């Protein structure tokens, strides 16, 4: 009787040894074989059923909001969203702490003040000028956190939201002469 022919499976590491001479299995490298059987499988690049046109596959492109079938309605217009983004309720107040900088600025009796969050920073300047009794020809310089001078059209609520201290107060430093920058 002759020995049966040697048969190979698709994986050369899983071949059946012949009956005549035992051969050791080929050495396995830890870098080529996965360490565990729970390794993620490699996705095949087989074309989908809907790719019948014969063209090469195109990369996945993001869908626009109007082309998506998952959305039940389109989001609000960006301008409408931005118009309401900076609005504050009329009854919301912001606590402002006034600090004099330098020797030329007089101290206030009440350094804490509540101002409506919807008002512009020019209302803070007008309040301070009125409280200090500053004339029309004199200047007052205001700074947030002793760092920068905001524009007069900034909303006080936005400044408070971005620059309030750990006590929830907006620190406004003031001087009769330029103090910072």
Curated annotation (Swiss-Prot):
One Pfam family it belongs to: APG12
Cross-link named Glycyl lysine isopeptide (Gly-Lys) (interchain with K-162 in ATG5), sites: 181
Subcellular location: Preautophagosomal structure membrane
Annotated Polar residues bias: 1-12
Residues covered by region (Disordered): 1-64
This protein's record includes keyword Membrane: yes
Protein name stated in the entry: Ubiquitin-like protein ATG12
Listed GO CC annotations: Atg12-Atg5-Atg16 complex; autophagosome membrane; phagophore assembly site membrane
Biased composition (Low complexity): 29-43
Gene Ontology BP terms: autophagosome assembly; autophagosome maturation; autophagy of mitochondrion; glycophagy; piecemeal microautophagy of the nucleus; protein transport
UniProt topology in membrane: Peripheral membrane protein
Chief location: membrane
Molecular-function GO terms, alphabetical: Atg8-family ligase activity
Quaternary context: Forms a conjugate with ATG5.
Species this chain originates from: Pyricularia oryzae (strain 70-15 / ATCC MYA-4617 / FGSC 8958) (Rice blast fungus)
Family annotation (InterPro entries): Atg12, Ubiquitin-like_domsf
